[in-house]
Amino acid sequence: MPSYALLGATGATGSSVLRHLLYSGSSSDLTVNVLVRSKSKLLAAFPSLDKPRPSVTSSIPTIRIFEGDSTNPDVLCAVLQDASLVFMCVAQNGSPMGTTLVQNTAAALIEARRRQAQPRGELTVIQLRSASLNPVLAVQVPRFVHRVVCFCLAAGYADLRRACVLYEAAATEGLLQYVLVDPPTLHDARGTQTTGYRLIDTTDMKDKENQRQAICLSYADLGVAMCEIASRADELHGQGVGVTATGPVRQTWAVLAGFLLEGGLGHLDYRYGRENVVVLGVCILLLLGGLLYSIKA
């Protein structure tokens, strides 16, 4: 009987993964160990998890809920018990300077693997990353836009990079395998309707046409894509796999703009100091005001 672990199941990505595992109808013999910080929040989003499993012949997988911190190796030892694959969907909104959540979770997971009794079964980590960190996909975005996004989300991207370095070292050590999932901008966090997606092989340098990535993808389609990647993990080990939409996406740019603005201001504050940032902002506003006044005059 296959067994998965899912970290971060109450977030937009984790909940879309869990929703597909629960309702796709192809997971009857699957056990999923779900780690969340708040069990009550998970049950509010998925009330059916609080009810007895219908029957032995049900197509719904067996769900085991663990409550705790994803950076605690003791908790992860229990969550990883018998698991052959981990969906790493731990994340936080925005990009606060100094964030280390993803790399700390990776370090705790690797420590938990070291503590597991020998012989260990093989474990594959499906780590959500970003197209901005995949050279093949990032080059498709205008350079100025890419640089602005990387500046605004610098802290979150640095956290992801460090986590990936830890996974690479752990794979070399033989503790685990990993696959990196690189979506474009993600939209419609509360949506559940899928409209279609396609995986992108970023290792085939001759197939440029099929490496093209749309700029938007829904969380719902990302969840299904991550489940497909899980089913094909053996052929994708060590790769960065792109995901692109093939259908319409309900776009929520206002939410993303808020995250970019918050991250950008935080990065400016960190590099130049809040007072200097405020002075610069006032100067820009005065300059714009002067230009508008001169145009009207």
Swiss-Prot record:
It holds the Pfam family NAD_binding_10. Its main location: membrane. One of its GO terms (biological process) is sterigmatocystin biosynthetic process. It is a single-pass membrane protein. Coiled coil: none annotated. SUPFAM superfamilies: NAD(P)-binding Rossmann-fold domains. It is found in: Membrane. It is an enzyme of class 1 (oxidoreductase). GO terms for molecular function: oxidoreductase activity, acting on the CH-NH group of donors, NAD or NADP as acceptor. Belongs to the avfA family. This is Averufin oxidase stcO.
